[in-house]
Amino acid sequence: MASMAAAIAASRSAVMSGNRPLDDRERKRFTYFSSLSPMARKIMQDKEKIREKYGPEWARLPPAQQDEIIDRCLVGPRAPAAAADAGDVRDPARFPGLRGPTGQKLVRFGDEDITWQDEHSAPFSWETRSQMEFSISSLSIQEPSAATVTSDARSLAKAPQGTQGSKPAQSSRSSSLDALGPARKEEEAPFWKINAERSREGPEAEFQSLTPSQIKSMEKGEKVLPACYRQEPTTKDREAKPVPQEQQTLPSVSAEQEVPQPVQAPASLLPKATPTESPEKPPPPAVQRDEDDDALFSEPALAQISSSNVLLKTGFDFLDNW
């Protein structure tokens, strides 16, 4: 309201001081634009000063000349000169865009001769041009000509039979590799089934503790006895194992017996015995053989005792290393 009152007061003062009174339309225009903002009020006051400066001649001037006088008085002569000296200001460097025509359709506007090219009418595809132009046929091996076929046939005829026999073997190997895929899946199916049964806990679990060898036997369809029904190796089996080792030790003993004994010199040539201590005699071969047998019998028993305390491995490294 304060700005409106100030605009009305300014318009009244301008009318009172002017050479000619403002009509009703000019007064409303001045009041409206002066009430918009302080900058607009300042512009309207400057225009009134210019009009007062020219006096009664202002009304006789054409509107274009009035606008030119207002621009020259408000802006000043320096601003157009500075703009002219700047020359052609080029567009700043920005990201390059596609400047060519992208559309394939001409749009006509009604009956008038107005046409423009629709930039959104190009064919759309999720693939790029290089992907659409790519084809496997360009990478395929071209078929050899008849001359090359005949030369290959001649070279094969000259080649030895060994090389000809190796080619069917390679083809059979490739066919076996191709057939390995479904067979591998059929082998893995019972394995995962058994593994799922092992993961079940409680009395419902059928396979509470299985070793990798038992899993393999179950995959083959064989029945596996629980750990409680498995028999421990008897003492006869333990005695049967070191027999080959004992046979290996016997030739060494016989070789020692075959070594020729040194010929004893006559007693007259031997020096007199001194009271020094006699060297220790090696034990007879029979006693040494018994000790070796005891050591051989004791080693498997210790190995079995130590293996019973070790937890069985599952065969999966990522589970055993936890």
From Swiss-Prot:
PTM annotation (N-acetylalanine): residues: A2
Compositionally biased intervals (Basic and acidic residues): 183-203
InterPro entries, per the entry: DUF4706 (IPR031600)
Residues carrying Phosphoserine: S37, S130, S176
Superkingdom classification of source: Eukaryota
Stretches for region Disordered: 1-22, 81-104, 142-301
Cell compartment(s), UniProt: Cytoplasm
Polar residues bias: start-end ranges: 142-153, 161-177, 245-255
Gene Ontology CC terms, in alphabetical order: cytosol
Keyword tags: Acetylation, Cytoplasm, Phosphoprotein
Record has Phosphoprotein as a keyword: yes
Keyword Flavoprotein in annotation: no
Residue spans of biased composition, Low complexity class: 1-17
Main location: cytoplasm
Name recorded for this polypeptide: Uncharacterized protein C1orf198 homolog
